[in-house]
Amino acid sequence: MAASGFLLIASFMLVLLVLARPLGSFLARLIEGDPFMPLQKIEAGLWRCSGVKNVEMNGWQYALAILLFNILGIALLFALLMMQGALPLNPENMPGMSWHLALNTAVSFVTNTNWQAYSGENTLSYLSQMAGLTVQNFLSAATGIAVAFALIRAFSRHSAATLGNAWVDLVRITLYVLLPIALIIALIFVSQGVLQNLDGYLHITTLEGVKQTLPMGPVASQEAIKMLGTNGGGFFGANSAHPFENPTAFSNFVQMLAIFLIPCALCFAFGQVVGDTRQGHALIWAMSLIFVVAVVVVMYAELAGNPHLIKLGADSNINMEGKESRFGILATSMYAVVTTAASCGAVNAMHDSFTALGGMVPMWLMQIGEVVFGGVGSGLYGMLLFVLLTVFIAGLMIGRTPEYLGKKIDVFDMKMTALAILVTPAVVLLGTALALCTDAGRAGILNPGAHGFSEVLYALSSAANNNGSAFAGLSVNTPFYNLLLAAAMFLGRFGVILPVLAIASSLVAKKRQPAGNGTLPTSGPLFIGLLVGTVLLVGALTFIPALALGPVAEHLQVWLTH
């Protein structure tokens, strides 16, 4: 079993790196503004129709464009979800959502969180799935990548005032990257048996004589961008555990690759654009080290399972509860780590049924900011925030002004870095405290004790870090949780994006200093170790007290009573 686990990890990383390197080179061309000749005429037509001028923006113009674009997206999606009962492509006559669920869902999909307090097959029309959620899956992914593009340009340019054009970046990312790759992935999914139709639901009689309804729908097209854009919102309530979304072991492997593909490619692109490929390789090494250890820990925890099962007459104590037998323990454990290391949130098993230790690792990966490859765009700029913090700490230790890639890191940069790193932990911990201190919050807890606390902590961690997965034992489709989690998702998304763009605006104006004898090398093993240590230390200091009350306490309860 151990050999199979390591073979799965090794094969996944090998295929990922082989695919990500050429994509990284293409992304580097987009960042540097190289024209893509076959689509230049389409671009020009889009600029004319939309009235967009292809001129560069400064940091605040870029931030304002991104913010207004996403707020408009929330408003339009909210209206669509409220009115879906009166709109076409609704063969099952689904009514409009309640206002608080519609608001939660709109904020969720626009912020790339895809938190779902509903089951899609029982709640949404095909129009809402296609024109609402799928469109935002593309646009929210493009938003994250565009912010990463702006930050990369800030490091590669010097003595400049602009970061690119937000509208141009959004269009090019969608047209040149997301749409073509999503089309290829969708065709792979269809070949594996994922649904893609606009038929009404099938009403059948099983061999046992029981009536059953089989949901239909355009699943593959949404599933592709759901994974590629690290969105994670399922067409069905069971998400990628549903055989109509993820039918085979091969489709499961492709889904994991799709989640990490763009985040890994952006690291390669970063190294190429700044003129030192070793910088991108260092980020990949740091991310990979944390990722591999996390996968091994979850595999071990789920294979160790629950020692009380043998006493109760089970054949084995391995934890297969909530898992699909077509995937097994190893692939399920790895999927859980992939989806929470990235800001995806898709699940092929029920995380609420994991062991205490197996469930704690995905929760912790979200809590450290999802910087282990992370979401499309957000993973890279999140890790670069930790790079700046690491450089600052190293500068304090040797008594030098911190610098990274020849750019001096000043007080303003560190204030914005600290703000971006601390905003999501603050939202998570304050939101959890609010939920536990109010009757409305406690009413949603179905499992009392340490696990109930873990469910609330997981929900806020998932929302604030724009992940979207859940410990599903928490009843969240209430006005209290819909509004609380909507606020957490919005603050977690734009409370990081705005400081990141402020940092980019500051860095792009600075001169690049030549490396000297006292310059800290940022591409070697020493810096990689220091970076990993900084990520772990910040995560430990922030969340260990909360984790001790939840999954750690639950783990001790299980094993100390054995």
From Swiss-Prot:
GN (gene name): kdpA
Assembly mode: The system is composed of three essential subunits: KdpA, KdpB and KdpC.
Membrane topology value: Multi-pass membrane protein
Primary subcellular site in the record, as a coarse category: membrane
Residues passing through the membrane, by range: 6-26, 63-83, 132-152, 175-195, 253-273, 283-303, 327-347, 356-376, 379-399, 416-436, 483-503, 526-546
One Gene Ontology molecular-function label: P-type potassium transmembrane transporter activity
Family affiliation: Belongs to the KdpA family.
Entry protein name: Potassium-transporting ATPase potassium-binding subunit
InterPro entries: KdpA (IPR004623)
Role of this protein: Part of the high-affinity ATP-driven potassium transport (or Kdp) system, which catalyzes the hydrolysis of ATP coupled with the electrogenic transport of potassium into the cytoplasm. This subunit binds the periplasmic potassium ions and delivers the ions to the membrane domain of KdpB through an intramembrane tunnel.
Keyword NAD: no
Keyword annotations: Cell inner membrane, Cell membrane, Ion transport, Membrane, Potassium, Potassium transport, Transmembrane, Transmembrane helix, Transport
Organism: Yersinia enterocolitica serotype O:8 / biotype 1B (strain NCTC 13174 / 8081)
Keyword Metal-binding attributed: no
